[in-house]
């Protein structure tokens, strides 16, 4: 089994070659990680034209011998009735898909539900916590996969909410290399080779290129750590904790380039998303009124119409380094999403600094947020 995926949009469409080996790795990896068997029913509510639908939900069900239930679209109002009707034990997701389920009023069919696991990729840390709190004992199995680089990470235990976990057995070896986010290149040591990151240090994720791995749209980088190696660079920045678990910091194109240096957006979004009052959060850069650089801005939606307290907001963002905090957090009615429920930042970025509505501004002296401008 092999196929070609077209991702992106406009003039930036990318062709991704999914070989039989790549499909099998994802399919059998999912089946193993989720312990899928003939007693399971996988409910694929994700768009099947998305890699997660083809490789994870459908592939995992086939490899694990589980039943597969397909939906024409995701509808929170009928979701739990369908779960009961089909005996669903596994639910697939992409990005913020289950947000609408969490925001929906409690459903009688939700009580003592049969779902034991939500599997997918891209779930924000705040939403992850809401899912496990509301739908316990169901857990979240979060994957990260580069489409062609064979880098596959999985958070098997689910204990570290927001972590992408560790490399899936059988997938390519991965390393983090020091990366100059300003110059956009790897940092080399005195010997001319790339430098592997220390624990807690952010770097670019590399996947070792496999020999005879089929057609690749990305040319491997050769001679990075020694003269004979070959690696495929992702566009993703991670750090690794003391236990060996990987945490996504940002995608290189999404970095916010301020006068104080580059600022990753994911830590801002995670800090805001963990607030009970926040449903969705995005961080992005807009042109600075004072120069050619950017300033960090965040947009949030309320959870259940709750009011956001400036003190609580300040405490949440106080965990970030001072130069990485957004200068303004503004409340919006909703945040646009793609067909597979990924949050869109383009329109917000194009709009520039927010001109009205509820806003919280950073006091550069105190480090606190208040509603004054």
Predicted regions and their residues:
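Conserved AMP-binding/adenylation subdomain of ANL enzymes
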Residues: 24-41, 49-89
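Conserved pre-ATP/AMP-binding loop-to-beta segment of ANL
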Residues: 1-6, 12, 19, 35-41
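Gly/Ser/Thr-rich phosphate-binding loop
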Residues: 63, 85-93, 102-180
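AMP-binding/adenylate-forming catalytic core of the ANL superfamily
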Residues: 91, 145, 203, 207, ...
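Acidic/polar alpha-helix N-cap and adjacent early helical turns
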Residues: 336, 350-373
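Adenylate-forming AMP-binding core of the ANL superfamily, especially NRPS adenylation
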Residues: 123, 160-219
């Amino acid at each position: 089994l092999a196929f070609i995926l077209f991702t992106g949009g406009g003039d930036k469409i990318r062709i991704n070659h999914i070989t039989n080996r790549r499909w099998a790795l994802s399919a059998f990896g999912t089946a193993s990680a989720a312990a899928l068997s003939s007693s399971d029913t996988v409910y694929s509510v994700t768009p099947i034209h998305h890699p997660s639908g083809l490789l994870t939900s459908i592939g995992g069900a086939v490899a694990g011998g589980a039943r597969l239930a397909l939906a024409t679209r995701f509808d929170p109002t009928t979701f739990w009735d369908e779960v009961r009707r089909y005996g669903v034990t596994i639910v697939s997701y992409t990005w913020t898909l289950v947000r609408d389920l969490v925001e929906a009023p409690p459903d009688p069919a939700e009580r003592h539900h049969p779902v034991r696991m939500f599997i997918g990729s891209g779930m924000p840390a705040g939403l992850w916590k809401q899912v496990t709190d509301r739908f316990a004992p169901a857990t979240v199995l979060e994957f990260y996969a580069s489409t062609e680089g064979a880098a596959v990470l999985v958070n098997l235990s689910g204990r570290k909410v927001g972590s992408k976990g560790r490399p899936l057995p059988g997938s390519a070896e991965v390393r983090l290399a020091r990366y100059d986010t300003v110059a956009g290149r790897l940092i080399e040591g005195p010997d001319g080779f790339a430098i592997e990151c220390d624990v807690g240090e952010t770097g670019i994720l590399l996947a070792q290129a496999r020999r005879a791995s089929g057609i690749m749209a990305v040319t491997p980088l050769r001679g990075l750590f020694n003269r004979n190696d070959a690696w495929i660079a992702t566009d993703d920045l991670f750090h690794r904790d003391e236990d060996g678990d990987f945490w996504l910091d940002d995608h290189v194109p999404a970095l916010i380039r301020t006068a104080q240096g580059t600022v990753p957006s994911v830590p801002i979004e995670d800090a805001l998303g963990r607030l009970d009052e926040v449903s969705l959060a995005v961080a992005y850069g807009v042109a600075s009124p004072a120069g050619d650089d950017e300033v960090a801005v965040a947009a949030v939606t309320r959870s259940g119409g709750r009011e956001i307290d400036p003190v609580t907001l300040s405490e949440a963002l106080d965990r970030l380094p001072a130069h990485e905090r957004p200068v303004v957090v503004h409340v919006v009615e909703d945040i646009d999403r793609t067909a597979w429920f990924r949050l869109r930042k383009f329109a917000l970025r194009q709009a520039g600094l927010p001109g009205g509505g509820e806003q919280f501004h950073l006091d550069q002296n105190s480090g606190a947020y208040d509603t004054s401008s």
